[in-house]
Amino acid sequence: MSAPAPTRRVVALGMLGTVIGGGLLARAAAPLTQPLPNGASDDQLRFLEEAARWNLPVLGRADAPLTLVLFFDYHCPFCRQLEPELPPLVAANPDLRVLFAEYPVLRPDSAIASRMALAAAAQGRYLPAHDWLFRVQGRYSAHMVPALAAAIGADPGRLAMTMESPPIATAIRRNLDAGQWLGIDGTPAMLSTRGEIEGAVPAPVLQQFVAAMRHAAAAGVAPERPA
């Protein structure tokens, strides 16, 4: 995404993290404390239109009219706390899809986890890999590929080769560039046409956010999908 430098910054809710290359400050966002946003910025809307064409891994129907893009890091404790809330949210809202934007910013080995997940996606095994990686304790390593492949029913040789491929690196770099452009300095961060929310959002608040997305879409305000 080519764009000017971001003009807004998200509110810091808590700090766990480090400075990574390029000067991006990475942290894990604490549990949600701010009110729900009333709408997305122009930059966020532009991103949502572009992200709909990026073939991001998806939870839910690929053609669902409501879209929530999740920026996350496998080392983020609040991402781990949020993760089990998403399948029941999508099950309760069949018009919703969650797009996963791998955002490995907290530790150097976070990128290894993201590469393994996207390599699993190439074999149609993203969601099982996503769940498995969140259950890992400690550091991520390419030595985990055989265990991951066995757990999710993937080809380990193909997994190892794909995770080192240029398309995987490009996809992760694209997510990092987009997040920095948007001013996302913490995980988890969720974007929709209603705006951005951060942190370990409890299920009732997630449902409220989805209901606001649906209401806006029904009213013809900020459509969720590009024409």
Task: Go through each PLM region and give its residues.
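C-terminal cap of thioredoxin/glutaredoxin-like
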Residues: 3-25, 150-227
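Flexible, active-site-adjacent loop/turn segments at secondary-structure boundaries
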Residues: 46, 56-57, 101-103, 132, ...
